[in-house]
Regions:
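A helix-centric hydrophobic-segment signal that preferentially recognizes long
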Residues: 1-141
Length: 141
């Protein structure tokens, strides 16, 4: 074999090694991105489940408070609208925005509760408040 042929074979071998290495890196990065994407989807699914649980607890909580604070109708309407927005939200951004509305409405409801000491001693209210607080903690994590 001539020196020229050996040089061509060496160059081809080096190019093939570079191509194989680059392809291997591409496959590795793609697999990593796919697995990270799946992890994000799974995490968002868990958030979605907790948001749904929270939305399911709110009507009972509101009904308990309504019995004591019937004059606070606007707050109950705000909570109903915010809950409806959360349940009908499609994208994560819409759910985050609706959750913010619901947080604000629930905050106003909890301020109302402070004006009714007899409500704070109601067993059903306390249980629902504990469940809601536990759900809020799961959302925060």
């Amino acid at each position: 074999m001539g020196k020229g042929l050996i040089a061509v074979v060496v160059v081809i071998a080096i190019v093939l090694l570079i191509v194989l290495f680059t392809f291997g890196q591409y496959v590795s990065v793609k697999n990593t991105l796919v697995s990270k994407n799946e992890a994000v989807k799974a995490a968002w699914s868990q958030v979605d489940i907790v948001l749904q649980r929270r939305a399911d607890l709110i009507p009972n909580f509101v009904e308990t408070v309504k019995g004591y604070a019937q004059q606070e109708v606007t707050v109950f309407g705000d909570i109903a609208k915010a809950r409806s927005a959360l349940l009908s939200a499609g994208s994560p951004q819409e759910k985050i925005a609706a959750n913010g509305q619901l947080d604000g409405a629930l905050g106003r409801l909890l301020l109302i509760v402070e004006n009714y000491p007899q409500l704070k001693s109601n067993e059903n209210f306390l249980r629902l408040q504990d469940e809601l607080a536990g759900t809020e903690n799961r959302i925060a994590v």
